[in-house]
Curated annotation (Swiss-Prot):
<protein>
    <recommendedName>
        <fullName>Small ribosomal subunit protein eS6</fullName>
    </recommendedName>
</protein>
<keyword id="KW-0687">Ribonucleoprotein</keyword>
<dbReference type="InterPro" id="IPR018282">
    <property type="entry name" value="Ribosomal_eS6_CS"/>
</dbReference>
<comment type="similarity">
    <text>Belongs to the eukaryotic ribosomal protein eS6 family.</text>
</comment>
<dbReference type="Pfam" id="PF01092">
    <property type="entry name" value="Ribosomal_S6e"/>
</dbReference>
<dbReference type="GO" id="GO:1990904">
    <property type="term" value="C:ribonucleoprotein complex"/>
</dbReference>
<feature type="region of interest" description="Disordered">
    <location>
        <begin position="76"/>
        <end position="95"/>
    </location>
</feature>
<dbReference type="InterPro" id="IPR001377">
    <property type="entry name" value="Ribosomal_eS6"/>
</dbReference>
<dbReference type="InterPro" id="IPR020924">
    <property type="entry name" value="Ribosomal_eS6_arc"/>
</dbReference>
<dbReference type="GO" id="GO:0005840">
    <property type="term" value="C:ribosome"/>
</dbReference>
<dbReference type="GO" id="GO:0006412">
    <property type="term" value="P:translation"/>
</dbReference>
<feature type="compositionally biased region" description="Basic residues">
    <location>
        <begin position="81"/>
        <end position="93"/>
    </location>
</feature>
<keyword id="KW-0689">Ribosomal protein</keyword>
<dbReference type="GO" id="GO:0003735">
    <property type="term" value="F:structural constituent of ribosome"/>
</dbReference>
Length: 131
């Protein structure tokens, strides 16, 4: 049972939450696809896959099909940040499909549930609690 860290971005609040969960139900899904948040414990939420990283630290790229590692000539992010105008460099990146060896998956909330994310994760009453 491969586990992954899900980094859940909440566009309303601008906060991110880390959740460790099984990524087996998402194997085969691609960047941009929407899935039910129930898979990672966010009941009622719809989440969109935005990217990720494999166990070696190579980033996923939406324009490379499949789940393989490839060395490609890049001129823009993700996977390469040019220092000078027009700079290109050959870098190793992953494809846009989730595989069992993906250890971090970045997701964004596209549809909200009834309860807030901190409430579902048991974080409610931590830093904003009045004394």
């Amino acid at each position: 049972m491969p586990t992954a860290k899900f980094v859940v971005a909440d566009p309303k609040t601008g906060r991110c939450y880390q959740i460790e969960a099984d990524n087996t139900p998402l194997v085969g899904k691609k960047i941009g696809e929407v899935f039910d948040g129930k898979i990672i414990g966010l009941e009622g939420y719809k989440l969109q896959i935005r990217g990720g990283t494999d166990s070696s630290g190579f980033p996923m790229r939406p324009d490379i099909h499949g789940s393989r590692k490839v060395r490609v000539l890049l001129s823009a992010p993700p996977g390469f940040k040019p220092k000078r105008k027009g700079e290109r460099r050959r870098k190793t990146v992953r494809g846009n499909t989730i595989a069992p060896d993906i250890v971090q998956i970045n997701v964004k909330v596209v549809e909200y549930g009834e309860k807030s994310i901190p409430e579902l994760l048991g974080l409610e009453g931590g830093e904003n609690q009045e004394q």
